[in-house]
């Protein structure tokens, strides 16, 4: 437990940041989940639209350090790969 006033303040700030970061991480997961749902439903247009909405959010969270930049790139790459496979399957 923090004893000095500055340590108490830092503990309060850390808790506030932790809570805010958890909210942002949850938002990223929701955007990713929306893309995955559209992919599972085999709806290429809806998946592409959800992906276009998700990419800036994923990038912004990576820039802020909420998620690692490599994790952001991995999510974007995999989602885009699934969407491309879906649209190729629909075209064939």
Swiss-Prot record:
It comes from the Bacteria. Residues 1-23 are annotated as: Disordered. Keywords: Ribonucleoprotein, Ribosomal protein, RNA-binding, rRNA-binding. Transmembrane segments: none annotated. GO terms for molecular function: small ribosomal subunit rRNA binding; structural constituent of ribosome. Signal peptide: none annotated. Residues 7-20 have a biased composition (Basic residues). Pfam families: Ribosomal_S20p (PF01649). InterPro entries: Ribosomal_bS20, Ribosomal_bS20_sf. Binds directly to 16S ribosomal RNA. Belongs to the bacterial ribosomal protein bS20 family. This is Small ribosomal subunit protein bS20. It comes from Pseudomonas syringae pv. tomato (strain ATCC BAA-871 / DC3000). The gene is rpsT.
